[in-house]
Swiss-Prot record:
Pfam families: FabA (PF07977). CDD domains: FabZ. Its EC number is 4.2.1.59. The active site is at H60. The gene is fabZ. This is 3-hydroxyacyl-[acyl-carrier-protein] dehydratase FabZ. GO terms for cellular component: cytoplasm; membrane. It comes from Actinobacillus pleuropneumoniae serotype 5b (strain L20). GO terms for molecular function: (3R)-hydroxyacyl-[acyl-carrier-protein] dehydratase activity. Involved in unsaturated fatty acids biosynthesis. Catalyzes the dehydration of short chain beta-hydroxyacyl-ACPs and long chain saturated and unsaturated beta-hydroxyacyl-ACPs. It is an enzyme of class 4 (lyase). InterPro entries: FabA_FabZ, FabZ, HotDog_dom_sf.
Length: 154
């Protein structure tokens, strides 16, 4: 996945208050803090600040906290949801964006309190109501996770 950003253009930012209008998730499960840039129908970059106050750290692992990989994947899926809404418009009152499948998930290094996750998700294709994306998560420019995701809006 290579996200190509045109030179001399202002990044498109979406703050958390707007993200909350796009996604139904709330604390403690809203895992996208800010969109730092995107291009409708193509790609999106977002961040998640990992703090020691995350509820998951009470059990994963109290003496040596590591942000769970499944939550990295969930945050990546939420980033695809923001891209889908930014591309296709707001969801209807009774509509949800479902995480349908995941393939080729790989975890490269642990994520710990104090890290800032940067997600890059890219639209691949849409077929019969299922949208396929590829995603990567980075900390300090180093790959921590990658996966192919499928989501459905119903």
């Amino acid at each position: 996945m290579t996200i190509e950003v045109q030179e001399n253009r202002e990044p498109k930012i979406i703050e958390v208050t707007e993200i909350m209008k796009m996604l139904p998730h709330r604390y403690p499960f809203l895992l996208v803090d800010r969109v730092i840039d995107f291009e409708e129908g193509k790609w999106l970059k977002a961040i998640k600040n990992v703090t020691v106050n995350e509820p998951c750290f009470t059990g994963h692992f109290p003496e040596s906290p590591i942000f769970p990989g499944v939550l990295i994947l969930e945050a990546m899926a939420q980033a695809t949801g923001v891209l889908a809404v930014a591309t296709h418009g707001k969801m209807a009152q009774d509509e949800l964006y479902y995480f349908a499948a995941i393939d080729n998930a790989r975890f490269k290094r642990p994520v710990v309190p104090g890290d800032q996750l940067t997600f890059e998700v890219e639209f691949l294709k849409e077929m019969r109501g299922i949208t396929k994306f590829t995603g990567k998560a980075f900390v300090d420019g180093k790959l921590v996770c990658e996966a192919d995701l499928m989501c459905a809006r119903k």
